[in-house]
A protein has these predicted regions:
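Sequence-structural signature of the catalytic-core scaffold of metal-dependent phosphohydrolases
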Residues: 1-91, 99-362
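Terminal helices and disordered tails flanking the catalytic cores of nucleotide-processing hydrolases
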Residues: 270, 275, 284, 294-477
């Protein structure tokens, strides 16, 4: 047993065979050089990476397994039956981000459109690809949303670690399902419970680590979460021939709501901070320019489509396990460092220079929702109508027409900032004091489902800033 000291969870204990077979390998160690978040533009101390985060998710997962096994009578524990499921869960917790691309989620959008290709690549690695193909679509034939990095990590885990997964006593196909979050439609309700505890709507090992770790690393203050108490409240229960269900002690409701509160804070004030949104825009544009120069040998072209396609070539899925051996590159285990070194060759580009220097060429017209509604709220109009009106007028081409001869479209930048809002699932089950379990909905009423709240920022060049009052007046008209 290896012992690793972590600032968030204390000592993390990992089996020797997991260390040698998974952690101390090239693909996993690569995660030391994949930054966890984009928050450092505003919170400089947020210097944590996907490596320690993955270990943290494993630590949470191990405690969840211990909590479930402490109540063996709830589900009729049988070692030969349930241990392979628990071992699969622990490997999935450890490896769920093993193929995260450089700069984490920043470049994930460049894999969009390749989901079907990724699904095919994963099915090629599965023993039972037919049931996976059925289960990845809902009853309306709509495909469940699987993020590119989840597909990539599941594929990498099976391509490079399948033998090790089997040797540990786990089930490769189940590990892959846990990583991408696809539950079984028929039977396998116990396995589905474990899938939900790494890939759930509200509470899972993944979320419990990052809401704690991101807050600790960044230094901001928000709701506290008693993780130990919350984990101790988790049960998997089967009664009267029904399917297995994940249940939580009623005393944990406050802590569950605390997780949601921290997540909401992160969405509003960290992920969608105006500086972080602009910095992410710069990084994407800087890498698009870099890729266009290196692949197409064209640094003068301003064609956005060509530059985007060039970067998509660098983000081709197989580079995450086969390496980048094209366009003059010879890079294995692609990480943040590699993208940084590429960009340094083009410091004269405005996007590259701004990203490295933090000397931004554009400033936001408003910095928060409070700013926005103080500028544009009206007692006469519905807030949504007001928002839509400002959004429509703030299109850079509309602004260029309004200020024809004075400002150009390049003087304006509009960036969307989408907030993903979560609530306690209506299907979450609560274990009451009398030993029965009931849905959260039956106890507390129906909750609105997870949704997205749209918001946006308008950034102005230094020239446009001189017209700030006129721009506000036009948007308010």
């Amino acid at each position: 047993m290896k012992r690793i000291l972590d600032t968030v969870h204390g000592y993390i204990y990992i089996d020797d065979d997991l260390m040698s077979s998974f952690v101390d390998t090239l693909y996993f160690q690569r995660l030391r050089r994949i930054e966890q978040t984009s928050a450092r533009a505003v919170f400089p101390s947020a210097r944590h990476d996907r490596f320690i985060y993955s270990l943290g998710v494993y630590a949470i997962g191990r405690r969840i397994v211990d909590s479930i096994k402490a109540n063996k009578d709830d589900f009729g524990y049988k070692e030969a039956v349930h241990e392979p499921f628990f071992k699969s869960y622990l490997i999935a917790c450890l490896m769920h981000d093993c193929a995260h691309t450089p700069f984490s989620h920043t470049f994930e959008g460049y894999f969009k459109g390749s989901e079907e290709e990724l699904a095919i690549l994963l099915k090629n690695e599965l023993e039972d690809s037919e049931s996976f193909e059925i289960d990845r679509f809902d009853d309306n034939k709509e495909e469940f949303k699987i993020a590119p990095h989840e597909y990539l990590s599941a594929i990498l885990c099976l391509k490079k670690y399948k033998k090790e997964v089997v040797q540990y006593g786990a089930i490769p196909d189940l590990v892959a399902r846990m990583i991408v979050g696809i539950q079984y439609k028929q039977n396998h309700s116990f396995e589905n419970c474990l899938i939900s505890l790494i890939h759930g709507d509200v509470i899972d090992a993944d979320r419990l680590d990052y809401v704690c770790r991101d807050r600790w690393a960044s230094g901001y203050s928000t709701s506290t979460i008693d993780v130990a108490r919350l984990i101790a409240s988790i049960h998997i229960i089967k009664k009267d021939g029904e399917q297995y269900r994940v249940c939580y002690d009623s005393s944990a409701i406050h802590d569950i709501e605390g997780v949601l509160a921290v997540k909401e804070f992160q969405q509003k004030f960290v992920i969608n901070h105006h500086t972080i949104c602009y910095e992410q825009f710069l990084l994407k544009k800087a890498m698009e320019h870099t890729a266009n120069c290196l692949i197409n040998e064209d640094c003068s072209s301003e064609n956005e489509e060509t530059a985007t396609l060039a970067l998509k070539s660098l983000c081709n899925p197989p580079v995450m396990w086969d390496g980048l051996h094209a366009y003059g590159f010879d890079i294995d285990y692609l990480s943040d460092d590699d993208f940084v070194n590429m960009m340094k060759r083009f410091m004269d580009n405005t996007y590259v220079n701004q990203w490295f220097s933090r000397n931004y060429a554009m400033k936001p017209l408003w910095k928060s929702k409070a700013d926005f509604y103080s500028l544009f709220s009206s007692k006469k109009n519905d807030p949504l109508d007001e928002y839509n009106s400002v959004y429509r007028k703030s299109d850079p081409y509309n602004l260029e027409r309004e200020f024809r001869g004075e400002l150009k479209v390049e003087d304006f930048l509009r960036l969307n900032a989408e907030e993903k809002v979560s609530c306690i699932s209506n299907n979450m089950f609560i274990l009451t004091k009398n030993g029965s379990f009931q849905s959260h909905e039956s106890l507390f009423g129906h909750q609105e489902s997870k949704s997205s709240v749209l918001f946006f920022y308008l950034y102005l060049s230094s020239d446009a800033m001189r017209y700030k009052d006129r721009i506000i007046k036009y948007l308010n008209a």
